[in-house]
Amino acid sequence: MDDTPRTLADERRRLLQELEVERNQVWRNIEWCRIRDIDRAFAGEWSLRDIVGHLASHDAEVVSAFRDLREGRPVTYFDIPDLDRWNADHVERKRGIDFWSLLEQLRGSRAHLLEELDAVSDELLTDETSTQYRLLRSVIDHDRDHWHEIAAR
């Protein structure tokens, strides 16, 4: 990739557009679900409520990682020893929360993520070897994985 400011800005816009497209797919697929899907397991043991809570938790974890980077602290996001256990713990924590509140958490966590991304330079966000790029890519891929699960219900 040519590292001129114009191409870096273009690549940043492309990545942020991809992020937006994947999250819009999440929302679109949530909207197509029936009320009964909120608490009915259809993705393994997970219901729509569980997936929405999980996505909000994941966004919040990535926001924390971006803050850690910005503040010079080590990032532990990629070092979670038992990802299945982490996911199960976070899903369980959200199970008692009203579904509509979880949707608001999902909106809020994405807004916080976008704020953090605004603070990242084009160079870091578009460098495929940077932690910032890897974090952004993980969110894009994560949204894609889960909207596919919702769509397949």
Region annotations inferred by a language model:
Residues 8, 12-37:
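Long, hydrophobic N-terminal alpha-helical segment
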Residues 2-3, 36-85, 122-153:
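Short, contiguous alpha-helical
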Residues 1-14, 62-108:
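Short, helix-capping/interhelical loops that line the mouth of catalytic, cofactor-
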Residues 13-16, 20, 52, 56, ...:
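Short amphipathic alpha-helical segments with heptad-repeat character
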Residues 36, 93-97, 120:
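Alpha-helix C-capping/helix-to-loop hinge sites
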Residues 23-34, 60-67, 107-121, 144-147:
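Structural signal for well-ordered, non-membrane alpha-helices
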